[in-house]
């Protein structure tokens, strides 16, 4: 898009930049970054280099932005149909698909270069794998054709902790794969709660989301089952892996209890969109606080504090 063409839909170049920024769906990215950071802190036992953390999160941001931009290009037809998404940069005509593609390729190239030259090759490979899986498997093969679209496609959003772990250690082990699995199992309750809220939008464009195909009752049942699996699964980081300790354990217990309570409430009231909205919002908070607890638990000062408190009780 030339400057003249861009300004047909914008008053100034700041608005052009804003349109390209909106292509990246920036509200999605912070959650991906906090899962990356949590893996890095656990891998380094709370002593990750600030520079390495910054470079890895920057590379992850660029990769996620590239993936979301490519998604906007691919889904421009359904985005144009749905009232909720009609004002996005491509369907509204503010950004041309070809220029969005160039933008996405530049972002992906910068991400790969940053990882390979300043972090390591494995983390770069994993980041690019995430983009490829998101576009080829989820967006192209599954989203419009399978009721299991976000179940299988959720693997793309589960890759960030693998990237974070690889950035610190240069390899992968059981712990990062458990982190991957936690996010993978968390994704269906999170996304199906959203799908319950906007079921009509998906139905309008023939996207076979669970609520559209199976209905609200079946969806709420599946949400409950996945929540029932993911909450106890989070405790594998404590036993047998011993990757996290008391602080994380308490947080996982409390956060998990609330998650289960909200999922059960939705199961009892599957047609209540306010309850679905409450669960959707909480699922985001759940993952962010769970990862924050991982970070706090991994810090050396946390271990020292717990040891000090334990010694005081033992002396008394």
UniProtKB/Swiss-Prot annotation:
It is a multi-pass membrane protein. The keyword Kinase does not apply. It holds the Pfam family UbiA. Coiled coil: none annotated. CDD domains: PT_UbiA_Cox10. One of its GO terms (cellular component) is plasma membrane. The keyword Transmembrane helix applies. Belongs to the UbiA prenyltransferase family. Protoheme IX farnesyltransferase subfamily. Carbon 2 of the heme B porphyrin ring is defined according to the Fischer nomenclature. This is Protoheme IX farnesyltransferase. It comes from Microcystis aeruginosa (strain NIES-843 / IAM M-2473).
């Amino acid at each position: 898009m030339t400057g003249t063409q861009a300004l047909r839909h914008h008053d100034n170049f700041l608005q052009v930049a804003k349109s390209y920024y909106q292509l990246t769906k920036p509200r999605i990215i912070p959650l991906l970054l906090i899962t990356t950071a949590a893996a890095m802190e656990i891998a380094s036992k709370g002593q990750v280099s600030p520079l390495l953390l910054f470079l890895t999160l920057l590379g992850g941001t660029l990769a996620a932005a590239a993936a979301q931009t490519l998604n906007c290009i691919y889904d421009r037809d359904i985005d144009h149909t749905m009232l909720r998404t009609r004002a996005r940069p491509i369907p509204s005509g503010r950004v041309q698909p070809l220029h969005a593609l160039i933008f996405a390729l530049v972002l992906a190239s910068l991400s790969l270069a940053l990882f390979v030259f300043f972090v390591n090759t494995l983390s770069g490979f994993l980041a690019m794998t995430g983009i490829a899986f998101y576009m080829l498997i989820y967006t192209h093969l599954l989203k419009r054709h399978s009721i299991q679209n976000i179940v299988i496609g959720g693997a793309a959003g589960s890759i960030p902790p693998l990237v974070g772990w690889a950035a610190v250690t240069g390899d992968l082990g059981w712990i990062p794969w458990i982190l991957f699995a936690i996010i993978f199992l968390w994704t269906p309750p999170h996304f199906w709660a959203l799908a319950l809220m906007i079921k009509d939008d998906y139905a309008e464009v023939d996207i076979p989301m669970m609520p559209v195909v199976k209905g609200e009752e079946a969806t709420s049942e599946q949400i409950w089952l996945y929540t029932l699996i993911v909450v106890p699964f989070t405790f594998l980081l404590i036993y047998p892996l011993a990757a996290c300790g008391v602080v994380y354990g308490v947080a996982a217990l409390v956060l998990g209890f609330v998650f289960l309570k909200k999922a059960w409430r939705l199961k009892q009231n599957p047609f209540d969109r306010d309850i679905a909205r409450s669960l959707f919002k909480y699922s985001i908070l759940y993952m962010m606080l769970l990862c924050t607890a991982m970070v706090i638990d991994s810090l050396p000062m946390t271990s020292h504090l717990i040891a000090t408190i334990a010694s005081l009780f033992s002396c008394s």
